[in-house]
């Protein structure tokens, strides 16, 4: 604990916390959550992850119709495939984090965001005559990678805040991340109207880099 590591479950330090006063608990939350820079770094990272996710969900079908000439039905499948691949990616990220990285979820998040960055970049570079199936495949693979960090960042925050403050830490991270819904909707709509779709995806790539 003296070097900033979380308390282990069942240790004397954690058990003593059961007898603490309300003021002591508030001080614990202040130190472990609200004044913990790691929690805020995680919250900001999750904010960027959610921006990319909702940008694809909200604007992906519109882009495919307006810029690539896909039918509304074909473009609509983007959302369904994106979500299914996202669930698969989330489960895979959990296994990789436990088995390959021995619980070091931060490494899994970096790996996944690098995958998002790669496939969104490749998607942007595809010519307008690209087969629609390939377009959907690239967006689906992006979904596979982006849902892993979304799930694991909450786990990392819980570990940092300890079991006693895990819910509060997740609440802070979740609150900040969901602000991205408004930013994604309004921000990318403005960019597409004034600068074109190319800049929407360039902005998305920059945000994916920040999410790393």
List where the protein language model places each region.
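Helix-to-loop junctions at the C-terminal end of transmembrane segments
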Residues: 90-103, 192-193
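Cytoplasmic membrane-interface "Motif A"-like loop-to-helix N-cap segments
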Residues: 99-113
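Extracytoplasmic gate region of multi-pass secondary transporters
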Residues: 36-91, 150, 184-185
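A late C-terminal transmembrane helix in Major Facilitator Superfamily
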Residues: 163-194
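Intracellular juxtamembrane helix-capping segments at the cytosolic ends
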Residues: 147-162
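Juxtamembrane intracellular "pre-TM" segments in multi-pass secondary transporters
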Residues: 3-41, 67
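C-terminal ends and interior cores of transmembrane alpha-helices
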Residues: 114-128
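A membrane-interface helix-boundary motif in multi-pass transporters
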Residues: 104-107, 190-207
């Amino acid at each position: 604990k003296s070097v900033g590591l979380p308390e282990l479950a069942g240790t004397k330090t954690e058990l003593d916390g059961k007898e603490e006063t309300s003021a002591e608990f508030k001080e614990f939350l202040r130190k472990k959550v609200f004044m913990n820079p790691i929690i805020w770094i995680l919250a900001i990272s999750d904010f960027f992850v959610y921006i990319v996710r909702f940008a694809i969900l909200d604007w992906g079908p519109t882009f495919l119709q307006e810029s690539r000439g896909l039918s509304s039905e074909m473009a609509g499948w983007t959302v369904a495939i994106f979500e299914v691949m996202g669930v698969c990616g989330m489960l895979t990220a959990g296994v990789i984090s436990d088995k390959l990285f021995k619980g070091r979820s931060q490494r899994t998040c970096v790996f996944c965001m690098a995958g998002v960055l790669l496939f969104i970049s490749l998607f942007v570079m595809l010519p307008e005559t690209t087969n629609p199936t390939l377009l959907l495949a690239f967006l689906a693979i992006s979904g596979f990678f982006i849902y892993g960090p979304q799930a694991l960042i909450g786990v990392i925050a819980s570990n940092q805040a300890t079991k006693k403050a895990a819910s509060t830490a997740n609440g802070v991270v979740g609150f900040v991340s969901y602000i991205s819904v408004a930013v994604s909707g309004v921000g990318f709509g403005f960019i597409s109207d004034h600068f074109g779709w190319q800049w929407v995806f360039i902005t998305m790539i920059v945000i994916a880099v920040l999410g790393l």
